[in-house]
Amino acid sequence: MAFNKTYIRVGYSCMGMLVGFSAFLVWNIAYKQPWTAAMGGLSGVLALWALVTHIMYIQDYWRTWLKGLKFFMAMGVIFSVLSIVAFISFLCVAISRQQSLTDPTSLYLSCVWSFMSLKWSFLLTLYSHRYRKEFADISILNDF
């Protein structure tokens, strides 16, 4: 029996959520680096939104709530822009302060987590768009 891609996406989103939230806790408690913690937490929240998107797709809730998918797409775009701005800002500040790449409190790790947030916001936008397109086609067919 073939394994459905959606279930792989659910597992991947669960893993991303756990890693993002653990990064939030580690960089807040152990390293006292709030910027890296914030971007790790944002990555975890975006992975959680992607997980919710997949679960609602599996449970067929999106068919009746296409505006919700439009909202998720808008949030994905907004957080993509925010992540790009954060990545560039952290990179510029880390270079200007001549921080070490191996230091766990440097802003280079904030750049990494900004990129991870960008990845999850892009995936949130992509999956919301795909699911919306699929259900929009089905709703057009149901009108006849």
UniProtKB/Swiss-Prot annotation:
Topological relation to the membrane, as annotated: Multi-pass membrane protein
Gene deletion effect: Mutant embryos show severe erythropoietic defect.
GO molecular function: heme binding; heme transmembrane transporter activity
Transmembrane helix among keywords: yes
UniProt GO cellular component terms: endosome membrane; lysosomal membrane; lysosome; phagocytic vesicle membrane; plasma membrane
The protein's role, per its UniProt record: Heme transporter that regulates intracellular heme availability through the endosomal or lysosomal compartment. In macrophages, is the heme transporter for heme-iron recycling. Essential for macrophage iron homeostasis, transports heme from the phagolysosome to the cytoplasm during erythrophagocytosis (EP).
Protein name: Heme transporter hrg1-A
Organism: Danio rerio
